[in-house]
Amino acid sequence: MSDIKNFEFTPIGYIKSKSGENDAKETLMSPTGASVRSPGSVGHVRKARRRSINDTVNSSRVENDNDTFDETLPELEMRKLPQYRRVPESRTSARNSGAAPQEEQNRNDYSDILSKTSNPIKDQEQKIKDLEHENTVLKVKNVSYRSLLANYSGGSSQNNINLVEEVSIWKTKYLETNEKLLKVKQDFESYVQKMEQEKEVNTDQEKTKEPEVIPIDNPEYIKEREHILEELERVTEDFKNLRDRYNDLEIKFLSIQNELDEKKQEFESSTARLNEEIHTLKSTIDDKDATISEFKRKLGNAEDQLASIDDQNGNQNQKLLHDLKEREDAIDGLKEDIIEKENAIVHYKEEIQDKQNQLKESESKYAEVQKEFEDFKRELKKQTFEFEDGKKSTSRQLQELSVEKIQLEKQVCNLRGQIEKLEQQHRLTQSENDGLRTKLKHIESDLKNEKSRTEVKIKDLTSDLEDARKNLGEANNTIKELHHEIIKNATKSKDQLSEEVVEKDKEIDQLKHRVQRLDEELRTSQAELDKATKNREVDHELEIRRLQNKHEIEQESLKRELAHMTDEKERLVDLHRLDIETWERQIEALRKENENLISREHKESNNIEITLQDKNIQIRRLEADIVQLNEERNDILNKLRSLEQAKDRYKSEMKDALETISRLRVDLENNKSLKDSKDSLIERKYEKLKDEFKLMKKGYLDEMIKLQSRNRELNSDLQKRMDPSISTSANTTLADKLDYYKLKYNDEVRHNNDLRVINEYLNRVLRASAQDIRLNLLKVENDLNIDIHKENVPLSAPLSSSGGRPYSSSYTREFDKYDYRYRQKGKRFKTVALAVLAVIRMYRAAKKHNWNEQRIRYLQRKIIAKEDRITW
């Protein structure tokens, strides 16, 4: 027989005592120590090594292990335990001799019950290990998700910064819970040390006296245990909150990841667009630099021209012509500059048009957002009739969006004002350019007039000089001829010679006077010509200086205008960039707000659909219950009617009975001479009928009371079921799956409908093409028959009934419809409108298809993420 008598139950473990006089009394042992030492070992108990709390933190087995012990002590079964206490040695022999089977049975019962009990210290230790392991796993997951998010987004997104801040907050909360956990550990260790000290004290006490059992209802033990359990519950609740928050963060991470993908695409498109704009702006800057260099080159050319004009003052006529040509070239250059300016103005107009187009695109985007917002508002209005609670929040959001809309409209007005200012500046520059053009035209006309006048004067002077030179030549020739005649006629008579000499002298004097007069006229004309040329040179120099100063002033003004325009261009580029950034931020904020509102509304709509489905199910159940209750009510009413009919029947029977009784009484009174036996018989019959009537009445009353109570219960049950406050909580995963399968089913149905429509269309096309082929074959056969008939006609007969013209069949005339003459008529408005309507419908269908695909992918990822999530 075993030493069951030496064991005693305690809430901590076993106590084994020795019954011999020479054996030392041993200390209380934990199950770990008891397992180390065999029950039959001799000597003092070796203290077992206490296992480390952290030895299973890195083990993956903890996730799948079930709790070894119960969370609480089964006190009811503990009370049923047999109180094994130390028995005096005088009794042991009698118990061992007489009650061995009973002792064996008690031992078995004791071991069964003891296996069901729990060890609170080990349970607490195991729970602490589990919590530590879960905290480490959460820590590792948090670090991995943070690193993944940082690697994916590069730390540029504000959402990532918010998430990092939120993760740091949860890290501090985790540290607080870890500190609380350490505090619980310290409390647990202090409790273990206290228990060990109590064990040591108990061992010291056991050396002098028998071991006492710590009662289960010890107040200190109960208080300590309750404190530990409260701490454990608090820690587990914090851990549950952390786990819920982790699940929310994981869902949020998936949504943010989707948003990051969309933002990445938008960022790439915006960078491409901005690169194109930068390229165009660089090209415009290069063009402006080229124009500036061209202006500088032309300025140098003009200065060189002025220097050459100063150097070539000798040949004035050629200089004037050359200057006029150069001025014409300069005017042509200025015209080219003006054309370039006009091209630049056109380019600026195109840039302004591009800005306006971008503004229109932003306005169209804003209109689309506003349209989506209006659709969303209409949906909200539809839902506000059923859900009054969400009305305040949605109205507040609508007010915020309206404020943002007003701000956006103000910004649009400011941009329009800036565009109007730019247009005014453009008009001013255009008017200045027009003034410059008119001035250049006046200068050109003045120069042409001066040129023509000077050319006329020069021609007149040259003609006068040539006439004078001719006269001088003629005079010299006549003088020479006279000298020759004098020499020839020397031999003539003196008188004739003297007369002739006198005449010739007179002629010579006349000629000399004429030559002097002509010389004086030549000198005066030469002086006038020199004076006129000097005056013209002075005038031309003054005009050239004036034009040079004017050209320099215009050049300086053009340079200033060019610098101002470049500054204005840079300012407009910066302003446009800032406007684009602000618009992108506002659009991004509106998009986020819209997405949040859409997601929130979608969630609310999903919840509403789920609640509606639940309500529909409840309504169907209630309708079925109502139908059943109505059937029961009809049955009860039928029973009541039958009972009332029976009651009326019994009343009539009672009336008949009373009438018979009254008649019998009358007969009895009339027939007093009847025997007493007959009277007694009538009385018995009357009493019997009366008792039956009372029993029947009582039964009917009880049945009516039961039916009324049943009716009240059914009405109360119906009211409870129809109470809208009693509703079951919806399962989000089930709702997501329902939405996913619903969308998949709708897509399949739509696809099948499209295939059916395509099939019908192809069948119609095949039927129509077959019919056309049959008609064409009939026409060809008809033509062949006609050709055969024509071959059989004799040669003397005409070619056809149409007066010798070739045969024109209906088949050939049929294709004349497709000639260019028949296609001169334009398309009708209805055809164009139907085509536009078809395009709009196709666009809407494609947009809805894309949205359904995105929703299906999102639900699929969400369901997979929820199913793959580790559940603790």
Swiss-Prot record:
Entries under InterPro entries matching the protein: Spc110_C (IPR040593)
Signal peptide: none
GO cellular component: cytoplasm; nucleus; spindle pole body
Subcellular locations according to the entry: Nucleus; Cytoplasm, Cytoskeleton, Microtubule organizing center, Spindle pole body
Biased composition (Acidic residues): 65-74
Matching Pfam families: Spc110_C (PF18520)
Sections of the chain in a coiled coil: 176-723
Keywords linked to the UniProt accession: Coiled coil, Cytoplasm, Cytoskeleton, Nucleus
Quaternary organization: Homodimer.
Family: Belongs to the SPC110 family.
Protein name (record): Spindle pole body component 110
Annotated gene: SPC110
